[in-house]
């Protein structure tokens, strides 16, 4: 069974919890969860399938991340792929859980950053096109107009 299938199954039960998957010396989260983690820690999001993103971090960062989530009262569960995705650790703030609140904030900010990355990638991939200078001048003009 693929990791995304397992995550979807886990999220059916823990839909308002950040699910961390331990893979060796790294932890990964997927979908909405990755937006929240990227929002707080500026970890890079990786597109893994259609519009599903993931992000990962080394195990030595786990305590810092969990402390932040606990401070913000965001539920989480940690599962280990090697142990058939059994829950190793979890925190449940019950009605105080602020997962949705921070997901909405993260979705907006991270969504904007992803759009900027796509624009940047397009520009870099098309530096050899004849109209790229005109496009860049137009972008610079817009930035100047709005005083950015």
Which residues does each predicted region cover?
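Basic, polar low-complexity surface loops/patches
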Residues: 1-148
């Amino acid at each position: 069974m693929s990791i995304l299938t397992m995550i979807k199954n886990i999220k059916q039960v823990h839909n308002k919890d950040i699910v961390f998957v331990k893979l060796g010396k790294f932890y990964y989260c997927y979908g909405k969860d990755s937006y929240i983690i990227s929002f707080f820690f500026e970890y890079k999001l990786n597109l893994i399938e259609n519009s599903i993103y993931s992000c990962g971090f080394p195990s030595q960062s786990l305590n810092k991340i969990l402390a932040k989530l606990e401070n913000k009262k965001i539920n989480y569960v940690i599962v280990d792929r090697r142990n058939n995705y059994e829950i190793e650790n979890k925190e449940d703030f019950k009605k105080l859980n602020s997962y949705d609140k921070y997901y909405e904030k993260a979705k907006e900010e991270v969504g904007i950053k992803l759009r900027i990355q796509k624009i940047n990638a397009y520009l870099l991939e098309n530096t050899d096109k004849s109209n790229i200078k005109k496009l860049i001048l137009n972008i610079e003009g817009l930035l100047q107009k709005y005083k950015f």
